[in-house]
Amino acid sequence: MTAFVVTGTDTGVGKTIFSAALTGALNAHYWKPVQAGLEDGADRDHVARLAGVPASHVLPESYRLNTPCSPHRAAELDGVVLDLARIALPDVRPLVVEGAGGALVPVTRNTTYADVFAWWNLPVVIVARTGLGTINHSLLTIEALRARGVPIHGVAFVGDAVEDSEATICAMGEVRRLGRLPMLGQLDRPALAQAFAEGFRVEDFA
């Protein structure tokens, strides 16, 4: 059954918001294996609020780390050794898995998220900004994933419409253009569900 990994071209591009929207649209389970930074609430808490799925669909993290930085360093600061065996995929479907930061963020000193994605062998949705710099960041992300044999499902944009940038990324990167979420003035479940329905086709995630 359906399962996707959500990564981003950078931190703060809208991965969690998109993950919540996709989780709700698919009535999926959501899992973020490593949460680094707890002060502003965990991403799973935001997804639980925005996705509109049963509480049991929002799975607990394998690791909850205190410092909001790359997981490899957050683990070191907490005195935790990250065991990759503990981030094996849960046996539930449909499933939306959210990474941290971008594809080349280190999970350990020797392993990036892109390496983990290759191990999981699930299709990856790249969440990208539409603003200045996104072409470079997006194409670098595509290259990094392809170099590891990671299947790319497509790119989901977040932000104001920038037709040329969106089209250029997908043409040069030879990836599917899945749609775009606008910036929402009011971020709640009904507004997010409507924005996803207007910007994406759920059948593209079947």
UniProtKB/Swiss-Prot annotation:
It is found in: Cytoplasm. One of its GO terms (biological process) is biotin biosynthetic process. InterPro entries: DTB_synth_BioD, P-loop_NTPase. Its EC number is 6.3.3.3. Disulfide bonds: none annotated. GO terms for molecular function: ATP binding; dethiobiotin synthase activity; magnesium ion binding. Its cofactor is Mg(2+). Pathway: Cofactor biosynthesis; biotin biosynthesis; biotin from 7,8-diaminononanoate: step 1/2. It comes from the Bacteria. One of its GO terms (cellular component) is cytosol. ATP binds at residues 12-17, 98-101. Mg(2+) binds at residues 16, 46, 98. It is an enzyme of class 6 (ligase). The active site is at 32. Keywords: ATP-binding, Biotin biosynthesis, Cytoplasm, Ligase, Magnesium, Metal-binding, Nucleotide-binding. Its main location: cytoplasm. It catalyses: (7R,8S)-7,8-diammoniononanoate + CO2 + ATP = (4R,5S)-dethiobiotin + ADP + phosphate + 3 H(+). NCBIfam families: bioD (TIGR00347). PANTHER family: ATP-DEPENDENT DETHIOBIOTIN SYNTHETASE BIOD 2, DETHIOBIOTIN SYNTHETASE. Catalyzes a mechanistically unusual reaction, the ATP-dependent insertion of CO2 between the N7 and N8 nitrogen atoms of 7,8-diaminopelargonic acid (DAPA, also called 7,8-diammoniononanoate) to form a ureido ring. Homodimer. Belongs to the dethiobiotin synthetase family. This is ATP-dependent dethiobiotin synthetase BioD. It comes from Novosphingobium aromaticivorans (strain ATCC 700278 / DSM 12444 / CCUG 56034 / CIP 105152 / NBRC 16084 / F199).
